[in-house]
């Protein structure tokens, strides 16, 4: 099994390729690392292959904030330059400048 380098970085704001939500990346797995139940819950027409980076996002849409787990192929850079309004963002990140968040000291792997 080969893994690829992650295209997106922790602290980067991204949006979903299909669904209307955006978020800030707070962790990344080199390959799919969630449950088979979760895998099968992804609509088959957009179900990605498992051998690619998967990102943990503090996500938001028009109605709510939540944590999302999204494959690299389903993400695009967010070019709005706007911060994410997720209530937990300030617990993980200390600042937002130039469209990118900076982790708080001591947060990380």
Where are these predicted regions, by residue range?
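Mixed-charge, Lys/Arg-rich low-complexity intrinsically disordered regions
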Residues: 1-13, 18-22, 29-32, 103-109
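Intrinsically disordered, low-complexity, charged/polar segments
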Residues: 46-109
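Generic alpha-helix detector with strongest preference for long hydrophobic helices that associate
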Residues: 4-6, 38, 77
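Residue-level recognition of conserved beta-strand positions in structured domain cores
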Residues: 25-27, 59
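Intrinsically disordered, low-complexity boundary segments flanking structured domains
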Residues: 12, 41-46
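Short, solvent-exposed secondary-structure boundary/capping segments
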Residues: 32-41
């Amino acid at each position: 099994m080969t893994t690829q380098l992650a295209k997106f970085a922790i602290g980067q704001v991204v949006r979903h390729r299909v669904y209307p939500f955006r978020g800030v990346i707070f962790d990344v797995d080199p390959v799919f690392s969630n449950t088979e139940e979760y895998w099968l819950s992804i609509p088959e027409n957009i179900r990605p292959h498992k051998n690619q980076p998967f990102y943990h996002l503090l996500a938001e849409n028009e109605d709510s904030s939540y944590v999302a787990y999204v494959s690299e192929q389903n993400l695009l850079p967010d070019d709005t330059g706007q911060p994410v309004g997720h209530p937990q963002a300030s617990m993980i990140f200390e600042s937002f400048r130039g469209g990118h968040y900076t982790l708080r000291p001591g947060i990380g792997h």
